[in-house]
A protein has these predicted regions:
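Alpha/beta-hydrolase-fold enzymes
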Residues: 2-95, 99, 225, 229, ...
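Short, surface-exposed "cap/lid" segments of acyl-processing enzymes
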Residues: 119-123, 129-200
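Catalytic histidine-centered segment of alpha/beta-hydrolase-like enzymes
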Residues: 392-395, 412, 416-431
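Alpha/beta-hydrolase active-site loop
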Residues: 205-226
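Gly/Ala-rich beta-loop-alpha elbow adjacent to hydrolase catalytic centers
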Residues: 235-240, 244
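Short alpha-helix in the alpha/beta-hydrolase fold that links the catalytic acid
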Residues: 380, 394-403
């Protein structure tokens, strides 16, 4: 009897979902909320058990142990495929409901307004505490920045930094004392960088080929024209590393050295929460409804990985005296974290499908435009930089490139920090980036 009733209810729910998008949305929301709250409850329970058993040690160490227990349990639970699938179903039902109500155009108009407002703020945001630079006219919807220096470059080959499409480029030039740009500039490099700007709704049809082939090519050719160099070195950060890899595999004649910085290459090895959720998402529906992927959706995804830590980090940080420099750096990082730009729709669709779902890049089967990307074509010097504590791009997802390329001159640097720490930690600027600069100088 109970089994029969369960089957009847399942059939009823399925029928209602198919016939009514409201029910579909409601059921998917309830399912995801139930699984997500169960994960929070499980993590809280484990943290409480840790508290009961942590009788010795200082209050600070006990708190650290409890937080670690909560974080580890929550990450394990949130990385479960069933929860990831539930989240993807919920987002998909939400997208379909938005499409049904005609929110597509309303959303596009809202994000265009946001884009124009952001453009007004960009001169202020991009100049305070940044290394002086000038924007150079190029073909394409992006800016090529040339960082100014009072000293002439010591190395013949210029360096082009290829930024990510997810977050803003200025994490590499956050503050003078933790600026990768300034660090490498002091080591004698002539540095250029791509600023992809804030996309608008009519940019949604720009493709991966547009960025990885055309725009990077335009930037490379402009740098060559300005400097008189026949080649450039590329440094690709995160998804910018994907662009740099793709470009180098098809235009190696223009590239002297390739540096990859926290770049996802081999997703099958180990999936973080974000990578697992991303692989489960229906990118097609999201792009079809919204065009570009909203920046706030990206921010929300990062927040719900651990909402407790997100709330506690502020009172915990200010629980002890801080210098003005420390406070400035803290808020500079927070500003960058939530300054997520919308992701170009077609680029997102392509990367999610070919890299995160099918893992085609490392298999040499990824298609960009008319090209099949073969990493074995890359034979120039390559440096791969990873953070051993990176919870966005785990070490195993990046290290595979060492064996995937055809280069004989290649090096892996494993540094004990996280994704953002590679860019802004004092330890990285004292040890990591001088080592990167030394490696590059010997080949420039």
């Amino acid at each position: 009897m109970a089994l029969s009733l369960t089957l009847q209810m399942t059939a009823f729910n399925k029928k209602m979902e198919e016939s009514n998008p409201y029910f579909d949305y409601a059921f998917k929301w309830i399912d995801f909320a139930t699984k997500y709250n169960s994960a929070l409850l499980d993590a809280s329970s484990k943290a409480f058990e840790t508290f009961l058993s942590a009788r010795k040690g200082t209050a600070q160490n006990i708190e650290k142990t409890i937080r670690s227990s909560f974080d580890t349990t929550l990450r394990d639970d949130l990385n479960d495929d069933a929860l990831a699938s539930s989240m993807a179903d919920y987002v998909d039902s939400w997208a379909k409901l938005c499409d049904l109500f005609g929110y597509k155009q309303i959303t596009a108009n809202f994000y265009d307004f946001f884009s124009y407002a952001n453009i007004i703020l960009e001169p202020l945001r991009d100049n305070i505490n940044r290394t002086p630079s000038e924007a150079i006219d190029t073909k394409g919807r992006f800016d090529l920045l040339h960082y100014k220096s009072d000293l002439p470059p010591e190395h013949k080959t210029p360096l082009l930094v290829v930024g990510s499409l997810i977050n803003r480029y200025y994490i590499l030039d956050l503050l003078p004392n933790v600026s990768i740009i300034k660090n490498l500039q002091r080591q004698g490099f002539d540095i250029y960088a791509t600023d992809w700007g804030t996309p608008k709704s009519f940019d949604k049809d720009l493709t991966l080929e547009t960025y990885a082939e055309e725009y990077v090519e335009n930037a490379v050719e402009k740098v060559k024209e300005i400097t008189g160099s026949d080649k450039v070195s590329l440094l690709g950060y995160c998804w910018g590393g994907l662009f740099a890899l793709i470009y180098t595999s098809t235009h190696q004649e223009n590239v002297k050295n390739l540096i990859l910085h926290a770049t996802p290459i081999d997703i099958d090895k180990e999936k973080t929460i974000i990578e697992n959720w991303t692989a489960h998402l229906n990118a097609d529906d999201l792009v079809d409804v919204f065009g570009n992927i909203p920046g706030w959706l990206i921010n929300l995804t990062f927040l719900i990985r651990n909402p407790v830590e997100a709330m506690l980090k502020y009172p915990r940080y200010f629980s002890e005296p801080r210098s003005l420099d420390e406070i400035t750096q803290f808020f500079a990082i927070e500003t960058w974290l939530y300054d997520s730009r919308p992701i170009i729709g077609e680029v997102y669709r392509d990367i999610i499908d070919q890299v995160y779902r099918k893992n085609l890049l490392v298999k040499n089967k990824m298609i960009v435009g008319s090209d099949i990307i073969n990493l074995k074509n890359i034979t120039i010097p390559l440096l791969d930089i990873i953070g051993t504590k990176d919870d966005l791009v785990p070490p195993s997802a990046s290290t595979s490139v060492i064996n995937a390329v055809g280069s004989t001159d290649k090096k892996l640097i494993e540094f004990p920090t996280g994704h953002v720490g590679l860019c802004i930690s004092n330890m990285a600027h004292e040890k990591l980036w001088p080592e990167v600069g030394k490696w590059l100088a010997q080949r420039s």
